[in-house]
UniProtKB/Swiss-Prot annotation:
This is Uncharacterized protein AF_1096. The keyword Transmembrane helix applies. Disulfide bonds: none annotated. NCBIfam families: arch_flag_Nterm (TIGR02537). It is a single-pass membrane protein. The chain crosses the membrane at residues 13-35.
Length: 141
């Protein structure tokens, strides 16, 4: 009986190709996980608070009462009346005396020139540029 010698030259390139393909697939998966952001970073959200707005006791004012939720930083709030920004509307009286409006505190918002009018009042968080409150109220007059 004649013994044949097996030719092993054909096996080596096949194994090499399989290893290169496997390494390429693993590398692509690692890069894709970084590119597509598989991280736990969530987009910033505005403070979540229950706010009550009512007609102010004096002319050109409304009262804002914090009923629950996150404290509101008075220095990072934009006040919009009928879609237009009101500068210096939040004062340093009442709840905002320490720049934070906390649960149970009330702040007076001055809206000059709107006395007696029914307006749309929006409070926007400056850091996220998202609304905290959107409501309609009659301004004290």
């Amino acid at each position: 009986m004649v013994r044949r010698k097996m030719d092993e030259k054909g096996v080596s390139p096949v194994i090499g190709v399989i290893l290169m393909v496997a390494i390429t697939v693993i590398l692509a998966a690692v890069i894709a996980s970084f590119v597509f952001g598989m991280s736990n970073v969530a987009p910033a959200a505005p403070p979540s608070a229950q706010l009550q707005v009512r007609t102010g006791s004096s002319a050109d004012t409304v009262e804002l009462k914090h009923m629950g939720g996150d404290p509101i930083n008075c220095t990072s709030i934009k006040v919009l009346v009928n879609g237009k920004e009101e500068s210096n509307a939040l004062g340093s009286s009442g709840g905002c005396s320490d720049n934070l409006l906390k649960v149970g505190e009330t702040e007076t918002i001055t809206l000059s020139g709107y006395g007696g009018q029914y307006v749309e009042l929006t409070l926007v968080d400056i850091q996220t540029n998202k609304p905290i409150l959107m409501t309609h109220v009659t301004v004290g007059g």
